[in-house]
C-alpha cells in the first residue's frame, strides 16, 4: 500500500462579482466553507493556472463576463494506503465528489509520496 498526493481541478461559477480578484476570493471562500462544513479541512485549495496564448506566461484560470465568473480551482489531498495511483484518484474523486455535488472533477496530478 502506497501514499499519494492527488490534485484535481474543478470549475466553480461565481455570480455578482466586480472583478477577477473578487471572483478568486469568493470562489476559494465558498469551496472552503463547503469542505470545512463536511470536515475536509485537510484539502488544499488553490487557483488553477493556464497559459496565456499571447505571451506564454502562466495566468490565473478565471474568466469574467457580465459580472459572472468561472474559476478553475485546484484541490489537493494526500491519500494514504492506496493500492495504485488509479485507486488514489478514485478515492480522492469519491471523497470530493460527495461533498462538491454537481461539480465536475478532473485529474491534474498524482504523485507517490
UniProtKB/Swiss-Prot annotation:
InterPro entries, per the entry: UPF0212
Superkingdom, taxonomy of origin: Archaea
Family of this protein: Belongs to the UPF0212 family.
Family matches, as HAMAP family: UPF0212
Entry protein name: UPF0212 protein Maeo_0273
Amino acid at each position: 500500500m502506497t501514499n499519494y498526493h492527488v490534485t484535481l481541478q474543478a470549475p466553480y461559477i461565481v455570480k455578482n462579482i466586480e472583478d477577477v480578484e473578487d471572483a478568486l476570493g469568493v470562489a476559494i471562500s465558498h469551496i472552503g466553507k463547503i469542505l470545512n462544513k463536511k470536515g475536509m479541512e485537510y484539502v488544499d485549495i488553490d487557483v488553477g493556472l493556464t497559459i496565456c496564448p499571447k505571451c506564454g506566461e502562466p495566468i490565473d484560470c478565471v474568466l469574467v463576463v457580465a459580472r459572472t465568473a468561472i474559476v478553475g480551482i485546484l484541490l489537493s489531498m494526500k491519500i494514504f494506503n492506496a493500492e495504485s495511483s488509479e485507486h488514489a484518484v478514485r478515492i480522492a474523486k469519491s471523497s470530493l465528489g460527495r461533498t462538491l455535488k454537481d461539480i465536475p472533477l478532473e485529474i491534474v496530478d498524482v504523485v507517490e509520496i
